[in-house]
């Protein structure tokens, strides 16, 4: 149904891998990413029968009370090819208390991004920064951004987590991210459109 929405350029579903449930309930069962031609095309869907049909369909299999929505700008940090069936890690982040959004995004792009790009085995890395308009009128979005990383498979991702480079990335989190564990899921990507 999403494929019938006007202005959709790309649509990807990423389903949390089954083995993730062995460690407890993941933060999300998956994510849906939708890219539009532009923001106006996305806003033009409000009130349309097509969007209402998508929302009615979602209600059949998604607990909409747990669903989040953020509008982001993507920054591609590393863009090597990924094999079919690659492990796609998705981390949901918030800035540390008292940190301005601009400072958070700058640190993430300019300091944390290069650290992440150096992790062995990393194929692709995209930072999705929540758009500044999400903070208008004192609003506080659920997430300040989403980090998306791809590895050949789950074993490669888990091996990367044992490296000094990963440790440097983890240590840097304290410089700009909310204290505590990162909300993270390991998924399989399914490209529907694009």
Language-model segments: which ranges?
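Macromolecular interaction modules
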Residues: 1-194
